[in-house]
Amino acid sequence: AGNPYFIDLETLIEEGLLTKEECDSVDFGSNPAYVDYEKIYMGRFELLEKAFHRFVPDQAYETFVEKNKKWLEDYSLYMAIKNSLGGIAWSEWEAPLKTRQEAALEEKRVELKEQMDFICFQQYEFAKQWEKLKQYANEKGIQIIGDIPIYVAFDSADAWANPELFQFDENSTPL
């Protein structure tokens, strides 16, 4: 999944999802010697939420969601549940959620649908902007390379959604 911190707010202005005034009015911190990450997080997500509420899903969005369904459904559900529980690790969730009991998951899909849609919107915007940046760089003869982590974080959508691929004990603790 793409990190929403890297979604360019100016692009969201160009898309008509935000205004310059809205972006300028957010306090991201004024001390250049100190980075207030909480302030940045809160301000950025306040703006992303405004953009989301103005966003009208189109065919390109629907295609993105369908094309990425395999990971996006689990990721958006995982993040929505995690956010609704104050960020605690999935291994601390109540058993029906921790062990992915379908009735509990379906209840959360209904309850957290808007939050899941917001997360899908973020991933869509990130992917669009990433592709545009990559194309621009490639046209200038610049190849962008990256690395892929050789491990999966324990507290991740991947570990939660695919426990059969990991060695966990009966309490969902890594062995």
Where is each model-derived feature located?
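Acidic/aromatic-lined carbohydrate-recognition and catalytic surfaces
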Residues: 1-163, 167-168
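Short, intrinsically disordered, charge-balanced linker/junction segments flanking boundaries
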Residues: 171-175
